[in-house]
C-alpha cells in the first residue's frame, strides 16, 4: 500500500483516482479554503484533512510525515513573480511547495497546473521550476494532457509534471489517450430540461445510463444540484435567440451586449464536448456556458458532470463556492488514469 498526500487539494478531484485504486491510501490532504475542505471530508471520509495555510504545515501537525506520493500544485498566480527580487505572498506558495517536498521526501510527486505556466517569462520560469525539482534528486517527465482524451466530456488542457527519485531506473509513462470522446449530449442527455429560475431535482433522471460515461457518473438514485439561477428578461431573450455554438456577435443589434469577449453570452454545442469549465460556468457574461437546448446557463450538476464528478459527489458551501471547487478541479476521470500510470511505474511496468 502506497501512502498519498494532497496539498492544494480543493474538493478532491486529483485525489479521486488514487482513492479508488486498491494500492493507494490517502493519508492527509490540505487546503486553505474551508468549503473545499468540507467537500473533501464529505467524499474522502478516511483521509485526515488539515485546514490551514500551507505555510503552517510542519512535522508537528502532519498526521504522517513519511509519504510515498505527493499530489497537487500551487495556484497559477503563484509563479507570476517567481525569480524577481520582490516576491508577493502567492509567489511564496511555490517555495512552500518545495519546503513540503523536502519535509515529506516522497518517492514521487504529481504536479498540475495551467498550460500557460510553460510560456511564462519566455519559458524561463518553467525551467526554474524543473531545476528546483532536479536539485532535490528527482527525475522529471512532463506532458500536456487533455481531459477529453481520458473520458471527460470537456476540452481541458493542463500541464502535468511527474517527479520520481533517481533510485528508480525505469521511465514514467503518462497514460495513453482513449479513442472515444464524449459530447454534451452524451454527458447531460439524461437530465430533465429546466428553464431560468427552475429546479429540476424532483423531476429525476429522464432515462437509464446508455453510455460508459453515464454509467460512471450515475451512481446516485436521486438527482441533486440541478437548478438554474433566475435571469432577467433580456438575458433570457438572448439565450432563446442563440443557436448551437453562437455567441453575442451573432445576435441582432437590439439584443447584442455592448461589452464582453467573443466567447461570452455564447451557447455550447450539443453534439460536441464542452469547452473548458471554469468557476463561471453559470455566468453567461463571463464564459461560454449557455445550455444548447434550454434557455439558461449550466446547473451545478451539469458543471460537475462535465468535469466527470459522479452524481453522488458532495460539494459544500454557497452556490458560488461549489462552482469554484468544480471549476478549479482536476477531472476525476483524468485522475483515475494518472493513478494507474503512477502504480504501473512503481511496480516497474514499462507501459
Task: Label the model's feature ranges.
Residues 26-27:
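Short beta-strand element of Class I
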Amino acid at each position: 500500500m502506497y501512502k498519498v498526500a494532497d496539498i492544494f487539494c480543493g474538493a478532491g478531484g486529483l485525489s479521486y483516482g488514487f482513492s479508488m485504486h486498491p494500492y493507494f491510501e490517502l493519508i492527509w490532504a490540505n487546503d486553505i479554503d474551508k468549503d473545499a475542505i468540507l467537500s473533501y471530508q464529505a467524499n474522502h471520509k478516511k483521509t485526515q484533512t488539515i485546514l490551514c495555510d500551507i505555510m503552517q504545515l510542519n512535522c508537528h501537525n502532519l498526521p504522517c510525515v513519511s509519504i510515498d506520493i505527493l499530489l497537487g500544485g500551487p495556484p497559477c498566480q503563484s509563479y507570476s513573480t517567481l525569480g524577481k527580487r520582490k516576491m508577493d505572498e502567492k509567489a511564496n506558495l511555490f517555495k512552500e511547495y518545495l519546503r513540503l517536498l523536502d519535509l515529506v521526501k516522497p518517492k514521487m510527486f504529481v504536479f498540475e497546473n495551467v498550460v500557460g505556466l510553460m510560456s511564462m517569462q519566455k519559458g524561463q520560469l518553467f525551467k526554474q521550476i524543473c531545476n528546483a525539482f532536479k536539485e532535490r534528486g528527482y527525475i522529471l517527465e512532463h506532458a500536456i494532457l487533455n481531459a477529453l482524451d481520458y473520458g471527460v466530456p470537456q476540452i481541458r488542457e493542463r500541464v502535468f509534471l511527474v517527479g520520481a527519485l533517481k533510485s528508480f531506473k525505469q521511465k514514467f509513462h503518462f497514460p495513453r489517450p482513449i479513442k472515444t470522446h464524449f459530447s454534451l449530449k452524451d454527458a447531460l442527455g439524461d437530465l430533465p430540461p429546466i428553464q431560468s429560475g427552475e429546479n429540476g431535482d424532483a423531476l429525476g433522471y429522464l432515462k437509464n445510463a446508455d453510455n460508459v460515461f453515464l454509467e460512471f457518473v450515475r451512481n446516485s438514485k436521486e438527482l441533486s444540484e440541478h437548478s438554474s439561477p433566475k435571469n432577467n428578461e433580456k438575458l433570457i431573450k438572448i439565450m432563446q435567440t442563440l443557436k448551437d455554438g453562437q455567441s453575442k456577435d451573432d445576435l441582432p443589434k437590439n439584443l447584442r451586449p455592448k461589452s464582453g469577449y467573443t466567447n461570452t453570452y455564447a451557447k455550447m454545442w450539443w453534439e460536441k464536448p464542452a469547452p473548458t469549465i471554469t468557476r463561471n460556468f453559470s455566468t453567461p457574461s463571463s464564459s461560454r456556458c449557455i445550455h444548447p437546448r434550454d434557455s439558461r446557463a449550466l446547473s451545478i450538476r451539469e458543471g460537475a458532470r462535465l468535469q466527470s464528478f459522479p452524481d453522488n459527489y458532495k460539494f459544500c458551501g454557497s452556490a458560488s463556492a461549489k462552482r469554484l471547487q468544480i471549476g478549479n478541479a482536476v477531472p476525476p476521470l483524468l485522475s483515475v488514469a494518472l493513478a494507474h500510470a503512477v502504480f504501473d511505474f512503481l511496480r516497474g511496468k514499462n507501459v
